Amino acid sequence: MPRLVRRRGRPGSGQGVAMSLPRLCLAMILALSGVAVVAICLGETPLTLAQYAQALAHPASPPGEVLWSIRAPRVLVAALVGAALGLSGATMQGLLRNPLADPGVLGVSAVSGLGAALAISMGLAVLPGAIELAALAGALVAGALVVVLAARFREPEALILFGVALSALGGALTALVFNLSPSPVATAEVMAWLMGSVQNRDALDALRALVPMTIGAILCARAGRGLRMLTLGEEVARMSGLPMARLRVQAVAGSALLTGAAVAAAGVIGFVGLAAPHLVRALVRDDPKRLLWPSALAGALLLVLADLAARVIPTEQELKLGVVTALFGAPAFALLAWRASRSWRS
């Protein structure tokens, strides 16, 4: 049984029952593995026990193609995207010292979606990987702008305001692409992309996303110690020798890479980066450094569950992943905002 440590604290403060980090990560890996197995076994095409056995014994058989060429890559991409969003959200919440921050606060998601919309409207969807590369390029441009700003300004409020402006600009330009698109087919494709999905993803999509996600994860991990010191206050952290400019660049660049790779792989998916850190915050003693990897695992678990729900909910047309996360994430966001307002009043 995992060793639990009871801590006292006021409700909503992020304090309570804490678990050792290795055991927490192990428990979440086991839970993610179990959910992934269920997600691979369930789908639109039901299989019998004999067909499951055939798929295990002969991966090239028709049941094997369903399991290993269609469902397994889809689950893998969902897990990678969820992990990237969860880690990015935890990093942003630690850097901005705001539990309501998420990866979209930098504007990277909006500009990345704009890149994908431009690629689709220009007819580049026929080229393999063109949409993904355009989305990642948009994320890198937005990330570079935010990194430059993070290196120049000390106030986290300036970073938030710039991210809001960048999101508004990206959204406006995407709407302009809709307005000027000469083809209703291209417009429908852009809309489908912006709603987010891991449908029809394969192992190559996972490999494309893995490189920028790995670099982003390394940068966020290197920023972990600085995020922990930042909880003491920016002035105290600076007096302790923490290089604030380097910390901001590492955290922002890592978060931008993670978010951009996630959007490139699955489209725009909201609320995962916001919700994942809150699922495990009380179990890591509200420590930003200890929060990073459990948040990544929680994000992977959330998105695999959301994709499973999108597949098994009986509808004429499969639900988009971004729709499912928004339906469940919006009430969660409202609850977090309500709890935060109570703590501010107290």
Stretches with model-predicted labels:
Residues 2-346:
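Alpha-helical transmembrane segments in inner-membrane proteins
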